[in-house]
Amino acid sequence: MKFDILTIFPNIFQSYFNESILKRAQKNGLIKIASHNLRNFTADKHHKVDDSPYGGGPGMVIKIEPIFKAVQHLKVKSHKALPAGRQVKTRVILFSTRGKKLDSKVAKRLSKYDQLILICGRYEGVDERVAQYIADEEISIGDYVLSGGELPAMILVEAVSRYLPGVLGKYESLEDIKGSYPVYTKPEIFKPRTPPRARLARGGKNPAKGEAHQRRQALRTWKVPKILLSGNHKKINEWRKIHGCL
């Protein structure tokens, strides 16, 4: 799987993609991730990628020309890299607040492609003709506005990569998604101990309040649910289904 990201901030991805699961997947040749500077696909000497919108309005808009050139370049490059006769399954995605919500079903569907070209907007968005004629679909990560599509691109790359064979390690599970149900670890019983607020506030000791604080502390214990300590995996799985969020 090849991820090609079109952006005006290509260096923003390096730290995230060079850690953990994605770093290992790239090292093992399971995925390739490349960020491409849209300014390299401009024709003017200033490498201008934006302009003011027709009809007026605040801000600037990413132009269609560099995006079109970049997408065509990446498609041709991928086609040439394959043996003669084989077609590259490519999907061009534009990140947009009005797009389809990214969820596990969308990620799994996208994992069937050979190449995903991800278009990251900036400023006030991109020329609408990108959505109309270049992108195959628009995707959103939620009902809120971000400065650009770079963060959604990072999220999509990891979400899709997890569905590719070999990407997840021995102790990582796709079906039992971490965080889909409550998880606990040692100690079985945790007794939090914090300094008395009176002492912190006044910079000294207050015997009466100190004793009350100690009594309250003695009553505070945070325990692991007994069912998880039972060793009964059938009941544990039932508990997880009841308390799960997926």
What residue ranges belong to the model's regions?
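N-terminal nucleotide/polyanion-binding subdomain common to many enzyme families
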Residues: 1-74, 218, 229, 235-236, ...
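Hydrophobic/aromatic beta-strand patches that form the interior of the parallel beta-sheet core
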Residues: 4-6, 34-36, 91-93, 116-117, ...
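A short acidic, often aromatic-flanked loop/helix-cap motif at beta-alpha or helix-coil junctions
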Residues: 39-44, 100, 145-147
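S-adenosyl-L-methionine/SAH cofactor-binding core of RNA-modifying enzymes
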Residues: 62-79, 88-122, 128, 165
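Short Gly/Ser/Thr- and charged-rich N-terminal loops/segments
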Residues: 78, 82-89, 193-220
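Structured adenosyl-cofactor binding patch, chiefly the S-adenosyl-L-methionine
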Residues: 126, 130-173
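Internal, active-site/partner-interface "lid" segment
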Residues: 151, 163-193, 220
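Compositional signal for N-terminal targeting/processing segments
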Residues: 187, 191, 197-200, 226-230
